[in-house]
A protein has these predicted regions:
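Residue-level signal for secondary-structure boundary elements
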Residues: 14, 28, 58-59, 91, ...
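Conserved acidic, metal-coordinating active-site core of Asp-based
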Residues: 40-113
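Conserved phosphoryl-transfer catalytic core
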Residues: 9-43
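Charged catalytic cores and adjacent phosphate/nucleic-acid-binding surfaces used
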Residues: 96-110, 114, 118-205
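Short, small-residue-biased leader/transition segments that mark boundaries at the very start
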Residues: 3-8
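Residue-level detector of short coil/turn "hinge" positions at structural boundaries
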Residues: 27-29, 57, 138, 165
Length: 205
């Protein structure tokens, strides 16, 4: 299964490079793979490679340089602008079935919780209820992406379902330099339920 997923990702990366080149970026796939060092080559890494070498310079990169409109967090902004779902370099990847992923997490002693569902399913937040139906044990309700409306939807949903409520900053180091560890939007009304969820996690088998 792991080998199959790696092959799928390799093909997707090749198609991503092809699409970026068609858009006008002088992407060198081999250079990105070398920088990845055997790890997954992400769009954030593509941006880092291009922004760190004048050989890749193009006016298309200007917004992501220091002082540019998207230069505050250039790597993740590049991904959001070009690689996110619906963007011009997005390549659909056929990952494992969701229920198989849930089973795999449980089989290895983990607890399946959906991270930042409001970011992944913006405008389709009700998908989160289906994810709980099919095995997720909780939702990340508080983070740096969910607005007050989304929090107002996810928090009561988790409470009604008796699911786990979690929080997270989504800190990614240099990829998201404006996000610090432990910093996230929060609503004090749900503190007691969040603490109860944390206590449950400590005693789960």
């Amino acid at each position: 299964r792991r080998q199959r997923q790696m092959c799928i990702r390799d093909r997707a990366f090749g198609e991503t490079v092809h699409r970026l080149r068609k858009l006008g970026f002088a992407v060198d796939g081999a250079a990105v793979l070398a920088a990845a060092g055997g790890k997954l080559p992400t769009l954030e890494l593509v941006a880092e490679v291009m922004l760190s070498d004048a050989a890749y310079d193009t006016p298309l990169l200007a917004p992501y340089r220091e002082g540019g409109a998207r230069g505050d967090m250039p790597y993740i902004n590049f991904y959001l602008d070009y690689g996110a779902q619906g963007r011009p370099a997005f390549v659909p990847v056929d990952f494992m079935d969701y229920r198989d992923a849930v089973a795999l997490i449980r089989d290895n002693g983990g607890v399946p919780v959906v991270a930042h569902p409001g970011l992944n399913f913006r405008g389709r937040e009700r998908v989160a209820e289906r994810l709980l139906d099919f095995g997720a044990e909780g939702l990340e309700v508080f983070n740096n992406y969910h607005d007050t409306t989304q929090i107002g939807y996810f928090a009561p949903l988790v409470q009604r379902r008796g699911a786990l409520m979690t929080c997270g900053s989504d800190f990614h180091g240099k990829t998201k330099p404006l996000i610090g560890i432990g910093q996230f939007r929060f609503d004090d009304r749900f503190e007691s339920y969040l603490r109860a969820s944390a206590a449950r996690l400590l005693v789960l088998p």
